[in-house]
Amino acid sequence: ILHDQYVNNNFYLLIDLGELEVKGQINSNLYEDKECWIYIRYYYLKALLELGLYNKAREVVDNCDNQFNLLNINSNITFEYQYLLADLDHLTNYFQNAISFSQALLKKSSTIDQKIKCQYLYAHCLRHIGEDLNLAFTVFSDLAKSTSYKNDKIRIRSIYSAASIKMFQRDKNYNYKNSFETINEIICNDDKNEIWKPYVIRHKAIYEYKICKDPYMAEKTLREAINLLEVTSLRIKYDIYFELAEVYRIYDNKLNNYEKSLAFYSEAEQFAKRVHDYNLQSNSQLGIMLLNLKYGYEINIEMLRTIIIETHNLNLNINYNYAIYIKCIIANEAIPRELSLYWKKMQYSDLLLYSSKSKSEKYNLKLTVM
């Protein structure tokens, strides 16, 4: 019954039920059946996450007694509940915790489907942090090629995540076309996979811009995605807004492009603030800074200091290095040699490429929400 309510998007009903359980206002006999209790708490938290109420979900978890732990995984629902807690760490910017939790959960997993979910979350958080992109790529590639499972969601996301890392590294030899063709085949084989189209479109646009060097096609692709998403509140819509802002910032020095870029960055930033997504928020703020520098406007130095501190604290390593890059531009300082060597080692190809360009060209650094 609870699952049916979730599938039918009756999130507020599940939240109301969850609130009653948390306040102890539900039938006390419920607690005699631990699995029944877990279902109520699980769908309560799932509903909060669907509505972007990540911090509320965090508060519920932090304020309630932890009535079971990793030693107690003896059914699918207990696994799913623990996996949700690991994903909550990811969604609330505790990436290192999510990595540790997903690795521990992997050891307790009893089915292939459970194992691949843990592996995907592990690689996904590695990609966010950006300190071991090659390991993340290896995990995504293995998941993309594996024939031992049938989870299309994991496969599609693994394929485009692997491609996204190679695009970030500016690998021109990677077979991006094959990746997008494979995803298209998976989507065409099952109508239920249509929901993943906007997510794929985002990466296809980055491919068109960075690898094919065709900003006009990238803009067209992103605009098509917006037409699909305009009436929704899905997070991916704001990722698309961010990518459009990037295209308008970089490819033409026109006043109307400044205004369009600023508007899309601002939409993405405000959404990210609402759901406490500091990855998207800080990238949007850094994009606005590069935009203003390009057009000769002032930037918020105090905000830049905050981004440097917060991205360092949250282990958002790529964002942190973007902020340091901008700090050097503002101070009119050369990029320190040790920093350039670090970017080369980490394969932060855009930072390495644009750090050697003229000052006016430095503003065209392509930012990536990993």
Task: Show which residues each predicted segment covers.
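C-terminal non-catalytic interaction modules
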Residues: 1, 267-270, 274-279, 283-286, ...
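Short coil/turn connectors between adjacent alpha-helices in alpha-solenoid helical repeat scaffolds
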Residues: 2-15, 46-57, 86-97, 124-136, ...
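Amphipathic alpha-helical segments of tetratricopeptide repeats
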Residues: 19-29, 62-70, 99, 103-110, ...
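Structural signature of alpha-solenoid helical repeat junctions
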Residues: 32-36, 73-77, 114, 132, ...
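Residue register of alpha-helical TPR repeats
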Residues: 36-39, 76-80, 117-119, 124, ...
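Structural register within alpha-helical repeat arrays
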Residues: 44, 85, 122, 160-162, ...
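Solenoidal tandem-repeat scaffolds enriched in leucines and small polar residues
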Residues: 114-117, 121-178, 192-199, 203
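Eukaryotic tandem repeat interaction scaffolds
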Residues: 190-313
